[in-house]
Each structure stands twice: as structure tokens, then as C-alpha cells.
Curated annotation (Swiss-Prot):
Residues 110-204 form the Ig-like C1-type domain. Critical for B-cell development. This is Immunoglobulin lambda-like polypeptide 1. Pfam families: C1-set (PF07654). The gene is Igll1. GO terms for cellular component: endoplasmic reticulum; extracellular region. Residues 93-104 are annotated as: J region. Interacts with VPREB1A. Interacts with SYNV1/HRD1 (via N-terminus); this interaction leads to increased IGLL1 ubiquitination and degradation in pre-B cells, possibly through a lysosomal, not proteasomal, pathway. InterPro entries: Ig-like_dom, Ig-like_dom_sf, Ig-like_fold, Ig/MHC_CS, Ig_C1-set, MHC/Immunoglobulin. It is found in: Endoplasmic reticulum; Secreted. Disulfide bonds join C131-C190. Residues 1-30 form the signal peptide. SUPFAM superfamilies: Immunoglobulin (SSF48726). It comes from Mus musculus.
């Protein structure tokens, strides 16, 4: 379409205005897909402005009621609703256009179980206490050990949080002593701090007899 002398952008049809904008930006060759609402169901959106396999910033235009991402040739299409969510969330478009939104998993307090050393462990001249912490979310916490009320760090080993099948987390913490160190003390405690709350479990060598 040719522009007549004196014709302004305000009189140009909307489609031509968008095309002219792309020409001015020099991005016509980079436009691969502009999605319509009917084609959105065939795309899977990772998130607003996200592009799988690329960390480069994305350019968005607003020709209508959708936000469209201008992406390089060969990349898959992406689109998102015009009204973006006000707080962070994960969302996907899949199947026949069904959108799944995960607003955030609720907090879950940890379940703490403290295990005494096994008889076989003690016969090998070792005493390993196991503090199993499970069912917590978010997946960050602190595990501390005490012997007769005194904090200890020597002989302590704690695993990194691992995700359970229910999307909650679990960790294991170990306190390893030699048998001679195990018997003289009366109380061993595992203390877990999660989201400002503390859970403590204790055992005694007398419980092994």
C-alpha cells in the first residue's frame, strides 16, 4: 500500500500501522509467527517473555488484545494474555487450549523423626544417629545437633533437600560418634528450624538397652 502525500499514521489501517512499525524497527525478517487466539492453543507458554533455550531479551508488540512476542526465525511461537498476573506464578497452555495456573504451594511444616544407632552400628564401634526431616515446604531449613544441650558440629553431615513425589521436600542429617563417646551422654537432640518455627526431637542411650 502506497502512502499519499500528507497522509498521517492516524488514517492508516491498523494492520498497515503495525507493519510500518516493524519496518521502521528493521525486524520484518525476524518475525516468524504472530499468533491469533485460535492458534494459541497449539503453543505452550513457559512464562511471560520466556523463550526456551535462549536468554536473550524478547520484544513484545500490542496490535490487539494479545501480547505477541517477536522471535527469530526457527524458534517456536510464544504468546501470553494481555493482562499479566500481578504476582509471580507458573502457567502453561497445553492440549486444547486449557490453561493451568499454579499460584504457589502452601507452606508445610516439617515432620522430624530421630533414629537411634543400630545394634550392628554399635558393634562396629560406631554410633550414628539419623534425623529424618520430611514433608516440608518451602525447601529450605536448618538442622542443628545438641549433646546434653550443648551444640555440636563435629561428626555432623546433612544432605541437600530433595523433592518428594508430592512436591514437598526431605533431608537427612547424621551425627556420627564412636561408641565410647555415645554411652557417657544422656541426651541427643536434633533441632530443625523452618520458616521461623523450630521442631526438636531427642533420644537417650538408655533407649538402646
Amino acid at each position: 500500500m502506497k502512502l499519499r502525500v500528507g497522509q498521517t499514521l492516524g488514517t492508516i489501517p491498523r494492520q498497515c500501522e503495525v507493519l510500518l512499525l516493524l519496518l521502521l524497527l528493521g525486524l520484518v525478517d525476524g518475525v516468524h509467527h504472530i499468533l491469533s487466539p485460535s492458534s494459541a492453543e497449539r503453543s505452550r507458554a513457559v512464562g511471560p517473555g520466556a523463550s526456551v533455550g535462549s536468554n536473550r531479551p524478547s520484544l513484545w508488540a500490542l496490535p490487539g488484545r494479545l501480547l505477541f512476542q517477536i522471535i527469530p526465525r526457527g524458534a517456536g511461537p510464544r504468546c501470553s494474555p494481555h493482562r499479566l498476573p500481578s504476582k509471580p506464578q507458573f502457567w502453561y497452555v497445553f492440549g486444547g487450549g486449557t490453561q493451568l495456573t499454579i499460584l504457589g504451594q502452601p507452606k508445610s511444616d516439617p515432620l522430624v523423626t530421630l533414629f537411634l544407632p543400630s545394634l550392628k552400628n554399635l558393634q562396629a564401634n560406631k554410633a550414628t544417629l539419623v534425623c529424618l526431616v520430611s514433608e516440608f515446604y518451602p525447601g529450605t531449613l536448618v538442622v542443628d545437633w545438641k549433646v546434653d544441650g550443648v551444640p555440636v558440629t563435629q561428626g555432623v553431615e546433612t544432605t541437600q533437600p530433595s523433592k518428594q513425589t508430592n512436591n514437598k521436600y526431605m533431608v537427612s542429617s547424621y551425627l556420627t560418634l564412636i561408641s565410647d563417646q555415645w554411652m557417657p551422654h544422656s541426651r541427643y537432640s536434633c533441632r530443625v528450624t523452618h520458616e521461623g518455627n523450630t521442631v526438636e526431637k531427642s533420644v537417650s542411650p538408655a533407649e538402646c538397652s
